[in-house]
Amino acid sequence: MTDIVDLELRVLEESDLSSHLELLGHLTEAPPLSGVELANIADMRRRAGIVTKVFCHQPTGRIVGSASLMIQPKFTRGGRAVGHIEDVVVDPSYRGAGLGKALIMDLCEISRSKGCYKVILDSSEKSLPFYEKLGFRAHERQMRLDL
């Protein structure tokens, strides 16, 4: 585990995009994208209201942890919203230092402040204990159709 003293938790900035994409490669397939492609995707996400919080290593500018939040207004539940947390990832050298927990708690607090009645996320089997420690519980099942 690496020292976390030089880390800042903040919103993803345009200057972070390449480093963020590199970090996402620890989570899933994340092929290289051009600067223009990254900027276009970031703009679409911003317009959709998606918030991505990151841990930035201040001396190097490297992104070492991130998670995203999408707020979905509902017609049910009196119009209250649901927070969807996605793409939670921490660089392997920083795992166990509490970054994942801090990211999740920060996004849960944003969800609460936006009036969400619940926060949901998808998880691999191996990550279930981590989320359960944070108060999440397994509920229903996810379905998927690859296009």
From Swiss-Prot:
GO molecular function, one term: protein homodimerization activity
Keyword Transport attributed: no
Annotated binding of D-glucosamine 6-phosphate, by residue: T28, E86, D87, V88, Y117, K118, D122
Subcellular location: Glycosome
Gene3D superfamilies attached to this UniProt entry: 3.40.630.30
EC number(s) reported in the record: 2.3.1.4
N-acetyltransferase domain segment(s): 7-147
Substrates-to-products reaction catalysed: D-glucosamine 6-phosphate + acetyl-CoA = N-acetyl-D-glucosamine 6-phosphate + CoA + H(+)
Biotechnology: Potential novel drug target for African sleeping sickness as this protein is essential for the infectious bloodstream form of T.brucei. Therapeutic application depends on development of parasite-specific inhibitors, because this enzyme is also generally essential for eukaryotes.
GO biological process assignments: poly-N-acetyllactosamine biosynthetic process; UDP-N-acetylglucosamine biosynthetic process
SUPFAM superfamilies xref list: Acyl-CoA N-acyltransferases (Nat) (SSF55729)
UniProt: acetyl-CoA binding residues: V88, V89, V90, G96, A97, G98, L99, G100, K101, Y131, E132, K133
Pathway: Nucleotide-sugar biosynthesis; UDP-N-acetyl-alpha-D-glucosamine biosynthesis; N-acetyl-alpha-D-glucosamine 1-phosphate from alpha-D-glucosamine 6-phosphate (route I): step 1/2
Function: Involved in the biosynthesis of UDP-N-acetyl-alpha-D-glucosamine. Catalyzes the formation of N-acetyl-D-glucosamine 6-phosphate from acetyl-coenzyme A (acetyl-CoA) and D-glucosamine 6-phosphate.
Family statement drawn from the similarity comment of this UniProt entry: Belongs to the acetyltransferase family. GNA1 subfamily.
Protein's name according to its UniProt entry: Glucosamine 6-phosphate N-acetyltransferase
Organism: Trypanosoma brucei brucei
